[in-house]
Amino acid sequence: MHFAREGYLRIFGLGILCLVLNLLGFTKLGFVFLLLTFFIAYFFRDPDRVAPEDDRYLIAPADGRVVTIEQNVSNDRWSTAPATRVGIFMSPLDVHVNRLPASGVVESVRYQEGKFRPAFAEDAAQVNEQNGVTIQDARGRRVVFVQVAGILARRIVCSLKGGERVRQGERYGMIMLGSRVDLYCPVEAQIKIRVGQAVKAGETIIAEYAERTSNASPP
């Protein structure tokens, strides 16, 4: 089992504190911090995932449950072209690491301040704090995915930069304490999931294009 790099210092620090408390005789308090250490380790877990390696597919950028599938979204703040928006709600118990839904070149990374309403609320995608990424694949198709903060999750982590070449299934960030990730699929991609379905980042196929490009590697 791997852990997200953002968690190593926290896990190590709590582990040392737990050890010191036990050595000083504060065993009950040490036990409390031991439980806390296990909780933090679970929170930052980062299991390996096997991507389909087929660029006909757009894969899930987050673990969680599909809460919305909205057809023909256009003139949105993140996507001016018509798209299908798939919203994935991440509970505090889900893996919090986010993965790339497609290969290509990062066109833009945009952060927007906002509120911290519950991520499953209908207006969360419009009013909450969020970070959106646009990728252009080898055939010029644009895919947008947006990390949305929630009532508990108030820290968004994204390591991507404009101009960077990326590969489908790679880790690119996380949202502390879960929340929501929205994936904007081009209208020509056929949606393969349904509302209420559980999905896994880097593995679950969200949508499929009719044709396949040369391979799933960045151009």
Stretches with model-predicted labels:
Residues M1-P219:
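Contiguous, well-folded functional domains in the mature portion of proteins
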